A protein has these predicted regions:
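Cys/His-rich microdomains that often coordinate metals
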Residues: 12-13, 30-31, 119
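Exposed aromatic-hydrophobic patches
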Residues: 60-61, 97-104
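Residues immediately within or flanking Cys/His clusters that coordinate Zn2+
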Residues: 3, 23, 112
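Short cysteine-rich clusters marking metal-coordination/redox-active sites
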Residues: 6-9, 26, 115
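Short amphipathic, basic-aromatic surface patches that mediate peripheral association
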Residues: 61-69
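Short acidic/polar inter-strand loop motif in beta-rich domains
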Residues: 114-123
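Cysteine-rich micro-motifs
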Residues: 20-30
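Short Cys/His-rich "knuckle" micro-motifs
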Residues: 15-20, 34-37, 123-124
Length: 124
């Protein structure tokens, strides 16, 4: 999975099938490929903590709970699996936790989270 962001409008696009693309554009400019963990945010508040219990997957953002305030919060948590992906949107005031259920024969691959100030983070 690859995430791209528009520098102007801040829109995020998710590429899920891995097909090569010459250039994704938004607002008349090329979109930037986001790389997990490339900002200066504290890893303990951003790297997803993942618990897999049978078909249930719980993703908590950070080993130290991430703030969920209007000015600083987790916008979404995405789960990559062997059969695709699932995504949950979060709002300020909510707990930085997302729960997912895997389908039969589906396995966890990675969890991603996006912080509005510190960008994309990943746990495999």
């Amino acid at each position: 999975m690859k995430f791209y962001k528009c520098a102007k409008c801040k829109k995020i696009i998710l590429e899920i099938n891995g097909s090569p693309c010459e250039m994704l554009q938004c607002c008349g400019e090329p979109m930037k490929l986001m790389k997990a963990g490339e900002t200066d945010g504290a890893a303990e508040k951003h790297v997803p903590a993942v618990e897999v219990n049978g078909k249930n997957v719980k993703v908590c953002v950070g080993s130290v709970e991430h703030p969920m305030q209007e000015e600083h919060f987790i916008q979404f948590v995405a789960l990559e699996t062997t059969k695709g992906f699932q995504q949950k949107y979060l709002k300020p005031g909510e707990k930085p936790v997302a729960e997912f259920v895997l389908a039969e024969g589906e396995d966890f691959v990675a969890a991603y989270e996006y912080c509005n100030l510190h960008g994309l983070w990943k746990k495999e």
